[in-house]
């Protein structure tokens, strides 16, 4: 290990696998987005069959994210975790200090496969930097109150920089805001309601993810085709924006959204929902999902019924990519790259060396297509591994990520 001392106060036992990726869960007071939307259809005219737009929807953010998908990022071509789209640099000279450094990390959780892959990748990034003398980590285990306490505790540990992945947006805002005057804060994955962190690191975002899948279906499904939309749960910001983007696209195209159902990220429930819709409608022409973790279960519902699998979107989990390849699916995999877990460590060191960083560090978020599927399909990696980890050249790969 290149750093002289590394103490992880809590790495949290792996909780039950859930299908949320980089999500926060502050439900709006009006409950917008709650409940099943399977009865949202408003007749054969195709108008607003997807129900009301989420209260999370912000038109300007939607437009900005869709535009960023085609912008050329700056940074090393072979290191997308160091690239940035439309970077607006901030001066960090006031934080410059001599090393070695003590970095601290308040992690929301390691309670799903996406976060587990990211956490392994972050640890490997830390191990590459001999100037990191100590890496102190507290895992909030998906609990807001614990993370608030964790952030306060870390401020008393003599951290040179504090990395935060907040469990939820609004609830963690005061804790992050309170830390900013005391230590440079690097925020990533999920946002909070203050711009006081030195930098906020994230992929393009939920609108881009949702649009990639929905636009694919508008190209692959005939006019009037029946679309089933599968969501995990309401009130989760990045999932709400994924659906908001898809809803906008479906509402503006001649596709028949026959149902919008919540699966709770459960494979068995997903399979049951899809099977019920097959029995009820006979034909489903396209599947849209706000997270790919249950995509294989949805595919299996068609296979069990002896029906061809319609066009659909998944995500960059290996089980879906392998099913796509083996079954020759018509598919796309929007991504929320786990390589973003490398970037906060890099950003913290740049800040402590007085180097500028983007105020909002927008990382590229490339979809996986039929043309590049083979590039991301990794033989020997476990089913729940995420392909866009940016970890292939790191020490310990593939074994530390569960591969062979």
Question: What kind of region is each of these model predictions?
Answer:
Residues 18-22:
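C-terminal motif of bacterial Sec signal peptides marking the signal peptidase cleavage site
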Residues 41-95, 100-121, 125, 129, ...:
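Extracytoplasmic "Venus flytrap"
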Residues 41-101, 341-404:
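Hinge/cleft segment of the Venus flytrap/periplasmic-binding protein
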Residues 64, 169-208, 318-330:
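Flexible loop/hinge segments that line or gate small-molecule binding clefts
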Residues 164-179, 246, 263-323:
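Hydrophobic alpha-helical
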Residues 103, 122-124, 211-260, 348-351, ...:
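An alpha-beta-alpha
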């Amino acid at each position: 290990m290149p750093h002289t001392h590394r103490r992880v106060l809590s790495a949290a036992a792996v909780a039950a696998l859930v299908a949320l990726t980089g999500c926060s869960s502050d439900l709006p007071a009006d409950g917008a987005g709650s409940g099943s939307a399977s009865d949202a259809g408003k007749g054969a005219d195709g108008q607003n069959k997807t129900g009301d737009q989420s209260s999370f929807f912000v038109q300007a953010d939607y437009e900005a994210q869709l535009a960023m998908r085609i912008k050329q990022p700056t940074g090393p071509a072979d290191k997308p975790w160091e690239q940035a789209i439309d970077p607006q640099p901030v001066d960090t000279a006031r934080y410059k200090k001599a090393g070695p450094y003590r970095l601290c990390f308040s992690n929301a959780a390691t309670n799903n496969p996406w976060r587990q892959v990211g956490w392994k990748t972050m640890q490997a990034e830390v191990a590459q930097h001999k100037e990191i003398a100590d890496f102190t980590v507290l895992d909030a285990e998906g609990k807001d109150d614990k993370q608030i306490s964790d952030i306060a505790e870390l401020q008393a540990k003599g951290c040179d920089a504090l990395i935060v992945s907040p469990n939820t947006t609004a609830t963690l805002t005061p804790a992050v805001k309170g830390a900013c005057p005391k230590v440079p804060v690097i925020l990533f994955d999920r946002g909070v309601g203050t711009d006081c962190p030195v930098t906020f690191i994230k992929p393009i975002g939920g609108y881009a993810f949702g649009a990639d899948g929905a636009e694919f279906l508008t190209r692959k499904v005939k006019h009037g085709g029946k679309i089933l939309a599968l969501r995990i749960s309401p009130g989760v910001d990045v999932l709400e924006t994924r659906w908001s983007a898809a809803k906008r696209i479906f509402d503006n195209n001649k596709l028949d959204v026959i149902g919008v159902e919540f699966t709770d990220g459960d494979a068995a429930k997903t399979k049951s929902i899809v099977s019920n819709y097959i029995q009820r409608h006979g034909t489903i022409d396209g599947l849209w999902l706000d997270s790919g973790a249950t995509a294989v279960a949805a595919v299996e519902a068609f296979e069990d019924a002896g029906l061809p699998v319609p066009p659909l979107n998944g995500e960059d989990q290996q089980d879906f990519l392998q099913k796509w390849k083996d079954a020759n699916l018509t598919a796309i995999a929007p991504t929320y790259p786990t390589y973003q877990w490398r970037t906060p460590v890099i950003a913290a060191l740049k800040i402590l060396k007085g180097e500028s960083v983007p105020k909002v560090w927008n990382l590229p978020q490339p979809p996986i297509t039929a043309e590049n599927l083979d590039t991301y399909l990794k033989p020997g990696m476990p089913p729940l591994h995420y392909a866009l980890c940016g970890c292939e050249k790191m020490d310990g790969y593939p074994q530390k990520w569960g591969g062979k």
